[in-house]
Amino acid sequence: MDYELLKRLDPEVFEAIANETRRQTETLELIASENFTSTAVMEACGSVMTNKYAEGYPGKRYYGGCEFVDVAENLARDRAKKLFGCEYVNVQPHSGSSANMAVLFAVLKPGDSIMGLDLSHGGHLTHGSKVNFSGQFFDAHSYGVDKETGIIDMNAVEEMALKVKPKLIITGASAYSQGFDFKAFREIADKVGAFLMADIAHPAGLVAAGLSANPVPHCHFVTTTTHKTLRGPRGGMIMMGKDFENPMGITVNTKNGPRVKMMSEVIDAEVMPGIQGGPLMHIIAGKAVAFGEALQPEFKAYAQQIKDNAAAMAAKFLAADYHIVSGGTKNHLMLLDLRNKNVNGKVAENLLHDAGITVNKNMVPFDDKSPFVTSGIRVGTPAMTTRGMKVAEAEKIVEFIDRVISAANDDNVADVCKQVRAEVRELCLQFPLNGYGLQV
């Protein structure tokens, strides 16, 4: 992208962007929630649609002059419906957290009980964490993974649900490398009269490609981000497989008298005006472009390579005596418990950063360290796969990581990081972004 005007008018901001461009170009991005969008997506996000207010929904705006942003939003909605096989889509949430907030506020009252995967077991802040709105407005209960297997214990989930009688059960995770049995979760939800929501922010691209279980047929609500494995701009989305009359009895007055609102109407109203005002139309345009890209055959090949690369990395880590929580991966990420390597997550993250490899420290189940230190790191393959890297490179990256971790307590660790960084840069330059992300 051409930044000549920015360089001349605001050299300080330009310098920050140039340095970030260099970082993305010359280092390895292994944070599981990050990816590189296409240049086409960035062009849409940087378009004149950033200038337009469009409160409301296509055909029902509170402002005039929305005929062309309506086209973009309808394209995003229609393409998302085709991608995920759903009847209802709202593409206006600014983030995955906003999408989750809208659903929770739509179907719950303050103090209602919810269930979600424990944050320290791989869940997400918005699934009931006490430091988040979801754990402050609602009576949150957390299910977890089995201490031995690292896999969600469905019997324990059912036992908790029967005891707690939640109004909403949330599936989904931010650091769980296995899949979710949505059918089993729905059976539990039906037993206790709960809504079921799947947050597929992480595997959404794999779901869209048909390479991970689709929750749409089983869940009342499905939320996601639009970046991560879906490779779009940063944003959120809400879906329903089938629309239905809201069971809370919320009505709307019509010329024929009151009628029960459809759930889609309740969700739409909770997004806007409930928690948001004007949607980000430039980002929604970017979402439309990304969804169009995800509908192409090449995207399925990309998603398969994400999984292949992750599986290869997991096998290589296990062979090098690393402990992967749950024993392996069925998606795009893995959570490494580093306690047997005598290094904590914070130290590992910092050393790998010095070596040109970006990961994030992450708590592991039953962790005895604080969230600011942690016992593990999370590693993901979406961004490296976007660069065109395959299994051979995935295995080489594990070797890079192992060299750094193995030297963590040695006097020469700085020299090791410096050498690895040079090799990482050389590898990255062999796989330029090629139209994905910023160009230097």
Swiss-Prot record:
Its cofactor is pyridoxal 5'-phosphate. The keyword Metal-binding does not apply. Keywords: Amino-acid biosynthesis, Cytoplasm, One-carbon metabolism, Pyridoxal phosphate, Transferase. PANTHER family: SERINE HYDROXYMETHYLTRANSFERASE (PTHR11680), SERINE HYDROXYMETHYLTRANSFERASE 1 (PTHR11680:SF35). HAMAP family: SHMT. Its main location: cytoplasm. It is found in: Cytoplasm. (6S)-5,6,7,8-tetrahydrofolate binds at L119, G123, H124, L125, S370, P371, F372. Pathway: One-carbon metabolism; tetrahydrofolate interconversion; Amino-acid biosynthesis; glycine biosynthesis; glycine from L-serine: step 1/1. Catalyzes the reversible interconversion of serine and glycine with tetrahydrofolate (THF) serving as the one-carbon carrier. This reaction serves as the major source of one-carbon groups required for the biosynthesis of purines, thymidylate, methionine, and other important biomolecules. Also exhibits THF-independent aldolase activity toward beta-hydroxyamino acids, producing glycine and aldehydes, via a retro-aldol mechanism. Pfam families: SHMT. Its EC number is 2.1.2.1. GO terms for biological process: glycine biosynthetic process from serine; tetrahydrofolate interconversion. It catalyses: (6R)-5,10-methylene-5,6,7,8-tetrahydrofolate + glycine + H2O = (6S)-5,6,7,8-tetrahydrofolate + L-serine. It comes from the Bacteria. It comes from Chlorobaculum parvum (strain DSM 263 / NCIMB 8327) (Chlorobium vibrioforme subsp. thiosulfatophilum). One of its GO terms (molecular function) is pyridoxal phosphate binding. This is Serine hydroxymethyltransferase. The modification N6-(pyridoxal phosphate)lysine is found at K228.
